[in-house]
Amino acid sequence: EITTRLVGSEMCIRDRTCAVLYGLIAIYVCCRYRLFLFKGISWFKIRPILMWGVPLIPHLATSWIKQGGDRYIINYYYTFAEVGIFSFALNLSNIIDMIGSAFNQTNSVSIYQVLSSNLDDKWERLQRQTKAIFIVYTIGVVAVLAVCSILIPLVLPRYAASLPYFYLLALSGYFQCIYFLYTNYLFYYDKTKDLMMITFFSSLLHLMLSMWLTQYSLYYTCLIYVFLKFIMVALVVYRANLLLNKYVKT
């Protein structure tokens, strides 16, 4: 116990020392390059930045609301073994989310280039690009499902019970990929407030449904992920199509 306290004390001192050093370096850099000066900055310049960025705060908090809330609710009603199986399935579905996010990094650049161009065939280009990325996402999801279905029972047989959960959560991950695709249009046209409203309130609904249904079965929790992700994607696609019809298709 004494050794543990000594180690903890040393780590605390080290962390505080690093924090002070980083703080001093930050102050030096700000003074050296005059980053504290706000000359020339006005409300008219700050306002569009705030209007674009502030709505993203609750938007980005939705992941914590959903997964953090689910973690506490599931831990309350189920054993550690059941929680571990479900968490493993959720982590597997996150692979699909990562695939969608990775491809979207490149795809978003192409979308912005088309939208900002003066081409006459913007709509046709975006349609072709959307079909192509849909095919990529579908192949990616099928590949992940196939690999996990084969390898998990062989390599990690104790986690084979997570596969039924994973199959449902994989569908939610596929919807997330579609969500990544269509949010690009909302970002481009500065509709982050609309995105915030959709994601934040869907997360609150997710939390309420989880508090109600999770106690009965973890399959209900998986279905909540699928259902609300579908609703969220449907709203984002609808809003994005309105923007495209207004600014691109006409």
Model segments located where?
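Alpha-helical transmembrane segments of polytopic membrane transporters and translocases
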Residues: 17, 70-72, 84-100, 131
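Interfacial transmembrane-helix starts/ends
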Residues: 50, 119-135, 139, 143-147, ...
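C-terminal transmembrane helix end/exit motif
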Residues: 17-41, 105, 181-185, 193, ...
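Interfacial segments at transmembrane-helix termini and the short loops linking adjacent helices
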Residues: 146-174
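Single conserved hydrophobic/aromatic residue that forms the stacking wall/gate
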Residues: 1-8, 12-13
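Residue-level recognition of pore/gate-forming positions within transmembrane alpha-helices
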Residues: 16-23, 91-94, 173, 199-204, ...
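Interfacial/gating helices of multi-pass transporter permease domains
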Residues: 45-52, 56, 74-94, 160-163, ...
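Helix-loop junctions and terminal segments of transmembrane helices
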Residues: 89, 93-119, 187-188
